[in-house]
Amino acid sequence: KTDDMPTYNFANVVDDHLMGITHVVRGNEYLSSAPKYNLLYQAFGWEVPEYVHCAPVMKDKTHKLSKRNGDASFQDLMAKGYLPEAVINFIALLGWAPSGEYNEQEIFSLDEMIKIWDPARISKSPAIFDPLKLRAINAAYIRALPAEEFRRLADPFIDSAVHCSIDRDLLCANLQPRCEVLEDI
């Protein structure tokens, strides 16, 4: 902190311990803070979590992705009509690759990701955030939705775009195969 008090480090360790955090996955720019956290854990007599430090996610080859620089947050993506499951799937594949029978697969359920995730498969090189890849993954999730679920998710976007009486079931049946992001409506 700017007043040189380690309140953030202290609060972070206490919060993680109280939440039962066993693994901390974070950017490698935080590698130097791990010894401070470990000293706090040891001082309290608490078990130190496993740390996994990852290369940063990059906007391009020279700039880190950062919400301070106007890059989209999770909430921004939700407001644009990205599905949470698609964003999680996309982020899981940034700087990590599945192995074995899954190494060619790109679309995963959360249960599949939990089952096959291995920190040893995290790349040491920075990953570049590819918005077109995110759109493609989101499109696959949209197309896999049951029609009723697509309609429920699409309705607010239809409300803001269509101002006349229309058969929404027919509209949704035509939109779902073409829509990559709900904001496309």
Regions found by a protein language model. Name each.
Residues 1:
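Short, Gly/Ser/Thr-enriched beta-strand-loop segments that form substrate-interacting elements
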Residues 5, 14-185:
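Conserved nucleotide- and phosphate/pyrophosphate-binding catalytic cores
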Residues 9:
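Active-site beta-loop-alpha substructure in enzyme catalytic cores
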